[in-house]
Amino acid sequence: MSSAIDTKKVVVEEIASKLKESKSTIIVDYRGLNVSEVTELRKQLREANVEFKVYKNTMTRRAVEQAELDGLNDVLTGPNAIAFSTEDVIAPAKVLNEFAKNHEALEIKAGVIEGKVSSVEEVKALAELPSRDGLLSMLLSVLQAPVRNLALAAKAVADQKEEQGA
């Protein structure tokens, strides 16, 4: 019997460490999805480097307490799956939100974004943000705009002087 308890303690430690280490964690209710839909969801999450696992709620509750994320205990009812991402904050929210739009059975319940418990609305707002690369390209274009405008103004002045001199 003690080996079963030891195994459960290891699982609780694993969940707690994933909750602490991941940049983004999303809890979803997958009830109503068939096997092929869950397989497709897992494939999409794997492609985004997101780990997707189903744990018992009692073990998840203990891990949540260890990770000091007590705000999640309210959503740990019914069948839940957890998506962990250690690389990208936006990736799990984006993939799960897109999948939920096409499959009404998938319900986003809550999340942990950079160590802070987040509501469904916050997770969905995060999902609507562009990816990191998209944000960087937007920033780059904003930074380039003044230089580009200066170059265009200098060219216009040069063209005007050239016309006057001709």
UniProtKB/Swiss-Prot annotation:
The keyword Repeat does not apply. One of its GO terms (cellular component) is large ribosomal subunit. It comes from the Bacteria. Keywords: Ribonucleoprotein, Ribosomal protein, RNA-binding, rRNA-binding. One of its GO terms (molecular function) is structural constituent of ribosome. Signal peptide: none annotated. GO terms for biological process: translation. Pfam families: Ribosomal_L10. NCBIfam families: PRK00099.1-1 (NF000955). Forms part of the ribosomal stalk, playing a central role in the interaction of the ribosome with GTP-bound translation factors. Part of the ribosomal stalk of the 50S ribosomal subunit. The N-terminus interacts with L11 and the large rRNA to form the base of the stalk. The C-terminus forms an elongated spine to which L12 dimers bind in a sequential fashion forming a multimeric L10(L12)X complex. Belongs to the universal ribosomal protein uL10 family. This is Large ribosomal subunit protein uL10. It comes from Bacillus velezensis (strain DSM 23117 / BGSC 10A6 / LMG 26770 / FZB42). The lineage of its organism: Bacteria, Bacillati, Bacillota, Bacilli, Bacillales.
